[in-house]
Amino acid sequence: MAIHLYKTSTPSTRNGAVASQVKSNPRNNLIYGQHHCGKGRNARGIITARHRGGGHKRLYRKIDFRRNAKDIYGRIVTIEYDPNRNAYICLIHYGDGEKRYILHPRGAIIGDTIVSGTEVPIKMGNALPLTDMPLGTAIHNIEITLGKGGQLARAAGAVAKLIAKEGKSATLKLPSGEVRLISKNCSATVGQVGNVGVNQKSLGRAGSKCWLGKRPVVRGVVMNPVDHPHGGGEGRAPIGRKKPVTPWGYPALGRRTRKRKKYSETLILRRRSK
């Protein structure tokens, strides 16, 4: 992905760094509309997720995370922009006439062929079970539950690594640094997710953030006491506490938020690095 810098004629162009445009002309049978009823609010209209609202209308693209078209070769026809994720997507034409969207693997170009199955080549974009992959393989779109479809390493530039296989489980190192066990029968896609340079983008202005459906974020220390525990005081005042807290009074910045006694506690060998 190419990053474009513009002539500094306005503050937004001075601070902005935008990605090269990828056209999107989605197929009608692979999209459907989404009904957003009060973004960030529950059925009573109460804000349950702050800093959400507005944004441009989107059509959801149906992505094939399962990759269950076994032993049928497909060809990459287009590489398109998807407003619902930061990775690009590819339109695949399979040999039996079916058409599906998949995540764009890094380095894949129009005209490349892909396939999924049990005895397929270890090639970028191919999907196969972990038991058939050699150690050290870079993978993405990884299943946690057999047949449910890929759930891990799906963001732009994400890549995991297969580091061990023992018994019925395979050991993976995830993009977050977490090391965990997954069934060897689960499938994954070879390679890294494309659009690696997405973190180099700079929106440059507040309006671009609003187009994404994200509202402004206000610090608690500049609020009133009725709005935040950090608020109040004369002029620029400290938070008045030993440690920072959330707007609801719970400890913030360092408190572990993972639920205790989850089923996957025994599957995680090393916590993610911060």
UniProtKB/Swiss-Prot annotation:
Domain of life: Eukaryota
GO BP of this protein: mitochondrial translation
Record keywords: Chloroplast, Plastid, Ribonucleoprotein, Ribosomal protein
Annotated stretches, region: Disordered: 225-274
Tagged with keyword tRNA-binding: no
Main location as per UniProt: plastid
Record-level Gene Ontology MF annotations: rRNA binding; structural constituent of ribosome; transferase activity
Alphabetized NCBIfam families for the sequence: rplB_bact (TIGR01171)
Family designation: Belongs to the universal ribosomal protein uL2 family.
HAMAP family listed in its UniProt record: Ribosomal_uL2_B (MF_01320_B)
Protein name, as recorded: Large ribosomal subunit protein uL2cz/uL2cy
Gene symbol of the encoding locus: rpl2-A
